[in-house]
Amino acid sequence: MNETTNEQEVLLLRRKLDLLLRTGKLLMESAADTNRIERNMKRVAAYLGIPEEKLHIDIRWTMLMVNVSDEKHSFSKFQKCEKHGINMEAISKISKLSWRAIEQDYSLDKYEEELEKIARQERNYTPYVVAICTGFACGGFCKLFGVTGLLF
C-alpha cells in the first residue's frame, strides 16, 4: 500500500509540474518578460502546494525547466517553447487566473480547464499589425534621440 501511495504522489506531482510548465509556456509564447513569467509560475506553484524553497525554475527563450527537490527526491520537467508572439490579453488572463485559483481554491481540473480556454483563444494582433506598430515604435525611438526626418 505504501508503494501505491508513493506512486500516486509522484503522479500528482508530475501533473502539477505539467500545469506549472504549461502556464509558463503560455506566458513565454505570449511575450511576457522573464520576471513576470517567474513571478506567475511561483504564484501558481504556491497554489499547487509546491514550496518555493524546493522549487527551481530556469527560463530560456526556447525552454522552460522546473525542478522540485528535497533531501531524498528530485523531479525535473522541461517544456519547449516554439510559437513566440505577442498576446497581452493572455498574459493578463493568466495572471488573473493564478490569483483566482488561490482565492477560490480551484481544483486541478478547474485550473487546467481555465488554462486551456486561454490557450485556445486567438491572438489579438495579426502579423501586419505587429509589423506596423514595430515600425512606429522604432520611429518613435529615433525621434526620442534626435534623429531628423531626413535621416529617418
Task: List the predicted regions and their residue ranges.
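Cytosolic juxtamembrane amphipathic/interface segments immediately preceding
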Residues: 113-123
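Hydrophobic, membrane-facing alpha-helical anchors
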Residues: 101-115, 130-139
